[in-house]
């Protein structure tokens, strides 16, 4: 009887990838050592290379998963709160995270942008692609809100989304630098004003 080549997978690939995504989100690409990833994912080195091939490919898959999950979340929020409400809810979510934990993980795409641009140029194109994906998504929400009359600000949608993303990502950076609940509340108010 012929033996099967290789061992069958004894782990859930999707679960392992999700765990890796959260680890990259918390620690960044460079700081995520292979041994740490293996421990977090609950798999052996042979299984890692057989399934994910390399740390870089795992990171790429993690960034894809993060984007997919985020888009699904934002679209769900839009269904619940409308386009304008979904954009405001993202800022409220950041505020709640600060209230509950005193810090924020920020956005994996934006966190990766600074890190990859400086040291891992070969990953920069992927990060830029994901940034554009979020930009297009948020801009579509703004355009929809303007068409429905929920957003009466008639400023060009590209300008609004640029300011909006700057506020969201700036808020995360401020929290990591020591800003607290009061500062984020100011930005929540500013976002609401922007999207009036």
Which ranges hold each PLM region?
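C-terminal peripheral helix-coil segments that are non-catalytic and often amphipathic
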Residues: 1-3, 91-96, 132, 136-144, ...
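Amphipathic alpha-helical packing segments from all-alpha helical-bundle domains
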Residues: 85, 121-147, 159, 189
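Hydrophobic alpha-helical segments that form the core
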Residues: 105, 110, 153-174, 190-194
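Helix-turn-helix
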Residues: 15, 23-57, 61
